[in-house]
C-alpha cells in the first residue's frame, strides 16, 4: 500500500509541476495581450514554483526507483560473494600468431640500424602524380610554358567556346 501511495504522490507532483509551468506561461502570454498586472504577478509566482515542484518530482521518482532496485542489487551481490572469487579468463597466444606489439618494437630496434648500414643506396625517385619509377637522367623532359603563352592559350579557347555557343543559339 505504501508503494502505491508513493507512486501516486510522485505522479501527482510531476503533473502539478508541469501544469503550474504551463499555467504560468499562459498567464505571461495573456498578460502581454490584455495588459493585466495581476496575471503577470501570478505568472512570475507560478513559473518558479512549478519548476521547483517538477524537479522535486523528478528527483523523487529517481530516488524511489533506486531504493526499489537496491534490494535486487544487494541480493545479486550476496549471491556472487557467496560463490567466492570469480575465475579470471586468460587467452594464450599460439605460436602461429604475429608477435605482440612490444615484442615487434624490440625486433625493429635491433634490425633497422643493420639494414641502413648494409644498403647505403638511396630510395628510387618517384613522380608526384604516381608511384611509377622515374629515371634520374630524365627528371625534367620539357620546360613549362611561360605565363604569356598560357594566358594566350586560355584566351584562344575562351573565344572559340564563345563562338560555338553563338553558333548553337542561332
Curated annotation (Swiss-Prot):
- InterPro entries in the cross-refs: TMEM252
| Keywords on record | Membrane, Transmembrane, Transmembrane helix
Tell me the PANTHER family matching this sequence.
TRANSMEMBRANE PROTEIN 252 (PTHR35682:SF1)
Subcellular location per UniProt equals: Membrane
Predominant cellular place of this UniProt entry's protein = membrane
Give TM regions. 8-28, 40-60
A Gene Ontology cellular-component term: membrane
Topology in membrane: Multi-pass membrane protein
**Protein's UniProt name:** Transmembrane protein 252
Region Disordered: list its residue ranges: 112-147
What would be the name of the gene that encodes this protein? TMEM252
Q: Which organism is it from?
A: Homo sapiens (Human)
Disulfide bonds, paired cysteine numbers? none
Amino acid at each position: 500500500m505504501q508503494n502505491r501511495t508513493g507512486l501516486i504522490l510522485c505522479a501527482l507532483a510531476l503533473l502539478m509541476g508541469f501544469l503550474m509551468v504551463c499555467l504560468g506561461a499562459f498567464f505571461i502570454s495573456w498578460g502581454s495581450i490584455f495588459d493585466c498586472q495581476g496575471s503577470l504577478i501570478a505568472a512570475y509566482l507560478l513559473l518558479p514554483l512549478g519548476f521547483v515542484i517538477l524537479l522535486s518530482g523528478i528527483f523523487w521518482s529517481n530516488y524511489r526507483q533506486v531504493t526499489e532496485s537496491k534490494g535486487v542489487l544487494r541480493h545479486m551481490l550476496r549471491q556472487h560473494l557467496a560463490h567466492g572469487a570469480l575465475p579470471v579468463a586468460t587467452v594464450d597466444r599460439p605460436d602461429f600468431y604475429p608477435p605482440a606489439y612490444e615484442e615487434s618494437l624490440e625486433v625493429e630496434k635491433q634490425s633497422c640500424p643493420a639494414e641502413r648500414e648494409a644498403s647505403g643506396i638511396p630510395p628510387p625517385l618517384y613522380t608526384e602524380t604516381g608511384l611509377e619509377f622515374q629515371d634520374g637522367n630524365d627528371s625534367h623532359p620539357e620546360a613549362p610554358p611561360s605565363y604569356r603563352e598560357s594566358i594566350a592559350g586560355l584566351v584562344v579557347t575562351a573565344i572559340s567556346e564563345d563562338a560555338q555557343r553563338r553558333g548553337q543559339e542561332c
